[in-house]
């Protein structure tokens, strides 16, 4: 989830586009056509060539689904297997995620397929609705548990939503802002956690033929973008459920109505922007001018992360400073996911919005900084832009609700992550046996000594594991002694718990039984109980550490909170006014019924109790 970007090689010699090389949309060579019905116009705009023609309007008129409507929730009928939320503290998942992250850091440059995308099409797209305006949806961090993911997908797919008195039609363009799947980028996980739920929400293409664009997040990058490119960047069968996929690379540029542009960038989990990508956007910049207004979608809210890691914002700042600013265009809106909540920072001429509520576990809002400077003053970039203050003006859930969610760690941790509780039980059982052996010298036989781990080794392992769990910052971040102090304190507390458990165990008759009965009793009786108690100690540690800004992610990842989801619905009017409707879902549906005898575009599953979306704040209007 977290990454530290490396600064790009400075390219400030990029000459501003001249009036002569900027052409108006009316004079561009245009390929493509108006899609069937009275819906959106999707056009590819190229410089006097059309190497990648748009699919004809009658290609796949009903999306890619020829599957009959299901009459049950059997995976064989649905075509995918609904998944439970990812148990983020499960031991094997922690290990595999750690290995994937390490491999991504060590070998990311070797797996990076962006350089190869230079051979793909370099299309620039146009999107416009029949009235000259456009409705656009933004959703991010979506491929997790079925209930949360499908609740959001269901709302996105409905012909219209009525939210706090506003009637909001289904968007003609859908933007997925990163992390379309969890925990890894396996194609099977994409099918079950992302594509399958969206297929059930919008099984076939409606008459307006909505279009989908996607930005890869860090979880999409775990396989070097292989599955992402296969799913979202295709020359054939350009359909994702009821949406058409349009992009030809992992990044894209879309001309929207009334001078607005949507640019989606891929910075490989915060590392850098590759040269083919910069060359692509250099060409896009030739079409921008002083009247252009830009929506920039990136995979991570680097403006927030820069508060702890000053280099985090460097890539985005470099992109704006060297690609967009020379054209005279204005970046009015930055969008990202990655942090699983809604938050908006407002500055002099720009809005910074994080909206990662598409289905992944909730991330807290009460630890967000009230004011940030973007870019940060302590960045190491040689030619950073002038820092501007931005104030936190809205968040969802609100800070009070976010704090209350934190207290749920005691109930949710052991039951959301049974493997983690089991691991704690095994660790404490071994620690108790080592302490009991050192206290009573009962390990007299060879068999007993084989099951007795040296006490000093067990204590060191326990404290070291606790320190690593606290994730002390590395050299690329700001060092905080509290990470080390809390980690050591947590380790000492676990050793103290083991000491108390050993004292209770020795007061019971089990240790005097003939071998191996004491070990069997420890595994059967002591292990489950001490594992549950130790999980509560971990929960208490996470609550205290989270209040000090340490292990905040683990405090909420361990709970897997499915509620308080969010997405954006945006409207661009023909006169150029952009209105942003931030939509929240306080409680997702957990009870679904099949919907077999409906139209082809109707959702396969409907909630038994209606979902009640609401605005997380009043609509934001950008003139």
What are these regions (language model features)?
Residues 145-147, 182-185, 216-225, 270-273, ...:
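Active-site environment of divalent metal-dependent phosphoester hydrolases
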Residues 273-276, 363-365, 589-595:
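A short, polar/proline- and glycine-enriched secondary-structure boundary/capping micro-motif
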């Amino acid at each position: 989830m977290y990454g530290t970007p490396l600064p790009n090689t400075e390219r400030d010699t990029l000459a501003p586009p001249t009036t002569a090389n900027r052409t108006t949309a009316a004079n561009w060579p245009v390929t493509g056509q108006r899609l069937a019905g009275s819906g959106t116009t999707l056009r590819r705009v190229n410089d006097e060539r059309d190497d990648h023609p748009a699919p004809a309007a009658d290609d796949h008129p009903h999306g890619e689904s020829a599957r009959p409507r299901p009459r049950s929730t059997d995976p064989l009928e649905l075509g995918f297997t609904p998944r439970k939320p990812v148990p983020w503290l499960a031991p094997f998942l922690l290990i595999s995620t750690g290995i994937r992250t390490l491999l991504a850091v060590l070998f990311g440059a070797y797996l990076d397929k962006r350089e190869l995308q230079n051979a793909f099409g370099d299309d620039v797209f146009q999107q416009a609705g029949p009235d000259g305006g456009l409705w656009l949806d933004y959703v991010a961090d979506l491929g997790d548990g079925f209930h949360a993911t499908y609740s959001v997908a269901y709302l996105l797919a409905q012909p219209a939503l009525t939210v706090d008195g506003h009637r909001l039609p289904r968007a003609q363009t859908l933007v997925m802002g990163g992390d379309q799947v969890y925990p890894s980028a396996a194609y099977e996980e994409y099918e079950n956690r992302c594509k399958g739920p969206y297929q059930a929400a919008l099984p076939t293409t409606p008459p307006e033929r909505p279009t989908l664009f996607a930005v890869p997040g860090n979880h999409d990058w775990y396989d070097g973008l292989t599955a992402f490119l296969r799913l979202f960047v295709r020359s054939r069968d350009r359909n994702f459920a009821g949406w058409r996929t349009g992009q030809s690379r992992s990044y894209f540029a879309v001309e929207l109505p009334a001078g607005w542009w949507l640019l989606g960038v891929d910075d490989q989990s915060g590392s850098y922007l590759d040269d083919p990508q910069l060359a692509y956007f250099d060409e896009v910049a030739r079409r921008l001018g002083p009247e252009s207004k830009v929506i920039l979608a990136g995979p991570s809210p680097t403006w927030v992360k820069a508060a702890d890691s000053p280099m985090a914002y460097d890539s985005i700042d470099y992109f704006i400073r060297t690609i967009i600013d020379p054209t005279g265009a204005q970046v009015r809106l930055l969008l990202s996911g990655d942090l699983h909540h809604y938050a908006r920072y407002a500055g002099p001429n720009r809005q910074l919005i994080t909206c990662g509520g598409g289905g992944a576990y909730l991330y807290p809002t009460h630890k967000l900084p009230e004011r940030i400077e973007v870019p940060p003053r302590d960045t190491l970039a040689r030619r950073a832009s002038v820092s501007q203050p931005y104030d936190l003006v809205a968040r969802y859930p609100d800070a009070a609700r976010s704090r209350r969610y934190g207290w749920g760690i005691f109930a949710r941790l052991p039951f959301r992550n049974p493997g983690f509780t089991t691991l704690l039980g095994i660790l404490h059982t071994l620690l108790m046996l080592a302490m009991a052996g050192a206290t009573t010298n009962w390990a007299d036989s060879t068999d007993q000594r084989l099951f007795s781990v040296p006490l000093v080794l067990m204590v060191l392992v326990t404290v070291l594991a606790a320190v690593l769990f606290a994730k002390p910052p590395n050299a690329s971040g700001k060092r905080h002694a509290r990470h080390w102090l809390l980690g050591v304190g947590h380790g000492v507390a676990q050793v103290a718990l083991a000491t108390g458990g050993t004292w209770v165990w020795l007061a019971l008759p089990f240790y005097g039984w003939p071998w191996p009965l004491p070990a069997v009793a420890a595994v059967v009786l002591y292990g489950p109980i001490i594992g549950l108690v130790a999980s509560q100690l971990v929960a208490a540690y996470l609550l205290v550490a989270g209040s000090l800004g340490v292990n905040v992610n683990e405090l909420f990842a361990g709970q897997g909170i499915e509620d308080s989801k969010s997405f954006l619905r945006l409207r661009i009017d023909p006169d150029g006014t952009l209105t942003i409707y931030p939509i929240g879902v306080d409680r997702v549906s957990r009870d679904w019924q099949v919907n077999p005898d409906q139209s082809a575009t109707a959702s396969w599953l409907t909630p038994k109790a209606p979902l009640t979306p609401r605005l997380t704040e009043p609509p934001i209007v950008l003139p």
